[in-house]
Amino acid sequence: MHGPHPTVKDIELSLAPEDIPVVCNVQLDEEDYTDVVEPAQQAYRVVTVCPKCSLPLRLVVECSHADIRALERLLLGTLKLVCPRCV
């Protein structure tokens, strides 16, 4: 503003977002990476039948206990495994 009294033309109402650079200079030690515990992986056999032709289907998955429970919920719901012949 210039002059002893502010006028409307002297007031700038600009609310544009400003680009603020985000810089992080923190380096993690090697031991910070080793603290993360991966869930134990285990092989599970899944045996079911094709819903179209009733042929047996077998597959093996390797996952955590929580993931096999999630797969079980999907298979008990609307997810169906179909054999290659019926696709």
Curated annotation (Swiss-Prot):
GO terms for cellular component: host cell cytoplasm; host cell nucleus. GO terms for biological process: DNA-templated transcription; symbiont-mediated perturbation of host cell cycle G1/S transition checkpoint; symbiont-mediated suppression of host innate immune response; symbiont-mediated suppression of host type I interferon-mediated signaling pathway. A motif (Nuclear export signal) lies at residues 68-76. Plays a role in viral genome replication by driving entry of quiescent cells into the cell cycle. Stimulation of progression from G1 to S phase allows the virus to efficiently use the cellular DNA replicating machinery to achieve viral genome replication. E7 protein has both transforming and trans-activating activities. Induces the disassembly of the E2F1 transcription factor from RB1, with subsequent transcriptional activation of E2F1-regulated S-phase genes. Interferes with host histone deacetylation mediated by HDAC1 and HDAC2, leading to transcription activation. Signal peptide: none annotated. Homodimer. Homooligomer. Interacts with host RB1; this interaction induces dissociation of RB1-E2F1 complex thereby disrupting RB1 activity. Interacts with host EP300; this interaction represses EP300 transcriptional activity. Interacts with protein E2; this interaction inhibits E7 oncogenic activity. Interacts with host TMEM173/STING; this interaction impairs the ability of TMEM173/STING to sense cytosolic DNA and promote the production of type I interferon (IFN-alpha and IFN-beta). InterPro entries: Papilloma_E7. It comes from Human papillomavirus type 94. GO terms for molecular function: DNA binding; DNA-binding transcription factor activity; protein domain specific binding; zinc ion binding. Keywords: Activator, DNA-binding, Early protein, G1/S host cell cycle checkpoint dysregulation by virus, Host cytoplasm, Host nucleus, Host-virus interaction, Inhibition of host innate immune response by virus, Inhibition of host interferon signaling pathway by virus, Interferon antiviral system evasion, Metal-binding, Modulation of host cell cycle by virus, Oncogene, Transcription, Transcription regulation, Viral immunoevasion, Zinc, Zinc-finger. This is Protein E7. Residues 1-38 are annotated as: E7 terminal domain. The keyword Hydrolase does not apply. It is found in: Host cytoplasm; Host nucleus. It comes from the Viruses. Its main location: host cell. Pfam families: E7. Belongs to the papillomaviridae E7 protein family. Highly phosphorylated. A zinc finger (unnamed) spans 50-86. The E7 terminal domain is an intrinsically disordered domain, whose flexibility and conformational transitions confer target adaptability to the oncoprotein. It allows adaptation to a variety of protein targets and exposes the PEST degradation sequence that regulates its turnover in the cell.
